[in-house]
Amino acid sequence: MIFRQLFDATSGTYSYLIASRRGAEALIIDPVLEKVDRYLQLMAELDLRLVKAVDTHLHADHITGLGALRDRTHCITVMGEQSGVDVVSMRVADGDVIRIEGLGLNVMYTPGHTDDSYSFLLDDRVFTGDTLLIRGTGRTDFQNGDPRAQYDSIFNRLLRLPDDTLVYPAHDYKGDTVSTIGEERRFNPRLRVASVDEYVALMNGLNLSNPKMMDVAVPANMRQGLAQAEIARRGWAVTARDALDFPTRPDVTLIDLREAAERARHGKIPGALHVPYPELQESIGPGGVLHGLADATGRRLVFFCAFGERSAMAVQAARDAGLATAVHIHGGIGAWKEAGGPIVM
């Protein structure tokens, strides 16, 4: 496995680049905007292809690299289902698995620092975001933080992992790089409490000043810019309501870009072909299945995904590949359901 812990000294943020091997798909956790060039350089050196960029939560102390990485690599951007961030193209829930070639991150909902905080378990290590820090815990006094929820996330979720599980947080300000669950149980001063009420009192009494970047970072991270807006401006989008008859039209092929777990949870549009977004480029290129289908039948390719972000990028890629009539369903499966479109489970 390729594993790199990368540090932004300005914000004290750790980002994590992960892949199963050289030449494979990669994902990155908690990227920082100012470090995007470095991430891309490192991935080029390691012959990696970024397919997913993940944030553990809405950050208040730096601007995320999710939007820039999406624009420069066409990767899938991932956050928890509670997140309101507009750049997110895939939303996950507790118990899901974020998969790339050869690896899978097990998704754990660990609210408390914020209401959209997640941790991700990969074999012998857990990426805890700002929920559990090295000899500390994330503050709970803004962004719908809740010390009671954080206590539950730490004591009833994270601390139940094996003692030798490596802990990789999103931040450290003392120079520490990694800990273990066992170390934090024994030595973390904020975990030396006898009850949830004692923990709540401890966290409520911290009286911390707001992060220096908070007034800039939070709004910037909420609005990274939708790929859908530009695609709609070019006339390459259809509304879900206008697409309601597409499943029965002989001149249209619907293409579902979501992953299998998303389809199982949220349902499928009848008759749609399943081409997961990471496999799209091969399918639309010369000799690819979708390119051949469009050439042989003359059908219009209509892409859709969960929210419309992946499908917007797919339309651009398809048109770049010569599929000049490709469009996507603006707003994805969510908009389709709101419009009353048929769904099969």
Give the label of every model feature segment.
Residues 28-31, 49-59, 78-81, 110-112, ...:
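Active-site neighborhood of phospho(di)ester-bond hydrolases with catalytic His/Asp-centered motifs
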Residues 12, 23-25, 33-109, 186-187:
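Active-site HxH/HxHxD metal-binding segment of metal-dependent hydrolases
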Residues 230-301:
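Positively charged, proline/Ser/Thr-rich regional signature most characteristic
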Residues 18, 30, 57, 69, ...:
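Divalent metal-coordination and catalytic microenvironments
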Residues 152-166, 170-241:
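Accessory terminal helices/loops
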Residues 5, 17, 97-122, 160:
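Core dinuclear metal-dependent hydrolase active-site scaffold
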Residues 108, 259, 275, 286-338, ...:
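Catalytic cysteine-centered active loop of the rhodanese-like fold, especially the PTP/DSP P-loop
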Residues 1-49, 119-129, 135:
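Conserved beta-strand hairpin/beta-sheet module of binuclear metal-dependent hydrolase folds
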